[in-house]
Curated annotation (Swiss-Prot):
InterPro entries: Asp/Orn_carbamoyltranf_P-bd, Asp/Orn_carbamoylTrfase, Asp/Orn_carbamoylTrfase_sf, Asp_carbamoyltransf, Asp_carbamoyltransf_Asp/Orn-bd
Organism whose genome encodes this protein: Yersinia enterocolitica serotype O:8 / biotype 1B (strain NCTC 13174 / 8081)
Catalytic activity entry: carbamoyl phosphate + L-aspartate = N-carbamoyl-L-aspartate + phosphate + H(+)
Pathway named in the protein's UniProt entry: Pyrimidine metabolism; UMP biosynthesis via de novo pathway; (S)-dihydroorotate from bicarbonate: step 2/3
Protein name: Aspartate carbamoyltransferase catalytic subunit
EC number(s) reported in the record: 2.1.3.2
Subunit structure: Heterododecamer (2C3:3R2) of six catalytic PyrB chains organized as two trimers (C3), and six regulatory PyrI chains organized as three dimers (R2).
NCBIfam families according to UniProt: asp_carb_tr, PRK00856.1
GO BP term (any one): 'de novo' pyrimidine nucleobase biosynthetic process
Keyword terms, alphabetized: Pyrimidine biosynthesis, Transferase
Lineage of producing organism: Bacteria, Pseudomonadati, Pseudomonadota, Gammaproteobacteria, Enterobacterales
Amino acid sequence: MVNPLYHKHIISINDLCREELELVLRTAASLKSHPQPELLKHKVIASCFFEASTRTRLSFETSIHRLGASVVGFSDSSNTSLGKKGETLADTMSVISTYVDAIVMRHPQEGAARLATQFSGNVPVVNAGDGANQHPTQTLLDLFTIQETQGRLDNINIAMVGDLKYGRTVHSLTQALAKFNGNRFFFIAPDALAMPAYLLEMLAEKGIEYSLHESIEEVVPELDILYMTRVQKERLDPSEYANVKAQFVLRAADLNGAQDNLKVLHPLPRIDEITTDVDKTPYAYYFQQAGNGIFARQALLALVLNAELAL
């Protein structure tokens, strides 16, 4: 039976239904316990990073190598024809798609990944982040980590803290968890960085419970997952950044009264929104979360590039 993700573009987490999300997570769990070092042997995957990245790029490229595929690409678009000669994104994608079996792409412009799919022919495009819009593979590793630590993706109490306006990770994760049952959201952010109205409207339309809060401590005892984010300096003007950067900081003392199963997650990089004393608590799970990116991205690439996959 052909898997439903074969040759499918993965641009938004909304491109995947609940059953497809669960397929990716099952595949990720299988690859974590039973590596498949030749699964994508002879495949070539382009890693096209038009925006700076450390974890996402290295995680993708490690995933590609561990599946036996080859990787080509760039991590600095200023040295490409697009950056130096003014080539359009459309032409860049049209050419790259003739070289490779799949394209992994990060771009600072919202909608760029969707645009790329119009010029990639039959070559699937995987969005590694487009501006403040979507970051679907981060969401897949977040879901994998939540399931790994909680044993479920239904009936989760999750708080999202910090930059909820520009943070594409929280946008995608909110949309993904809304596909499951009984989840409850606690949003903790300064007014200037509040969760976008369209996401709150989506939750309300689905009858999903959410609430807005001014402090972390007031909700900690109710939580299964505490999802911290940094204030994104690169997306704010200096005066706005100075006003909000230290408004919500998690310290170990703030976790007094937490349930035993609570895990603190963060898409990283961490700046100063989680103090290092949290690292020593049993609740910290952000480094393991980052490591899970290998398995989530391996799973997605394996499914996108294999018509039939049974692990």
